[in-house]
Amino acid sequence: GIDALVLVTNHLDPRNEGSEVFFATLQSLLAALPSSMPLGLYECPAPYRRLLSDDEFAWCANSGRFVVLKDVSCDLPTVERRVRLAQGTPLKVINANAAIAWPAMLAGAEGFSGVFTNFHPELYGWLWREGKNQRALADELAIFLSLGAVTETLGYPKNAKIYHQRLGTFDSDAC
């Protein structure tokens, strides 16, 4: 079996018709899934980026069924607002934008899950675990990670696979 199920927001509203379709699809899935199964949400950018509205997000948070959102808003005020909306619920916000990774963590996001965790997860892990205790170093690291993320558009995922092949963690760079 599975430990949890992550629902992709653009699949809950495939034609981007709005909240009515989103909620209808979500309700049918929730009725069919075991109530004990932890659920997540991912605002996957493909085939289109379907960000949750505040009402949709709050409903999911307050339902008690959802434990994680992979936020792809790329907008710190949105992450901050969602963290506030989720307070007191099981729902945790995980940011996926490297440019705001550290500020989002400081705002209460429960970590980072963007493309660059495929390159150097240990650096993001350190930032999450130790950053608040070593602010000067964390601030410098955050700048480095943000600047490094510019290379995301230079051939990902192939560039990550080449990197791991050179580290010896992958046998091939085939995509």
Can you annotate each of these PLM segments?
Residues 143-144, 163-166:
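Short acidic/histidine-centered micro-motifs embedded in hydrophobic/aromatic stretches
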Residues 37-38, 90, 171:
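Secondary-structure boundary/capping signal
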Residues 28-34, 44-154:
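Catalytic alpha/beta core domains of metabolic enzymes, predominantly
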Residues 1-51:
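Active-site beta->alpha loop and helix N-cap motifs at the rims of alpha/beta catalytic domains
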Residues 165-175:
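Flexible C-terminal active-site loop/helix
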Residues 160:
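Beta-strand-loop-alpha "switch" segments that mediate conformational coupling across diverse proteins
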Residues 1, 90-93, 156, 165:
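Helix-coil boundary/capping segments in enzymes
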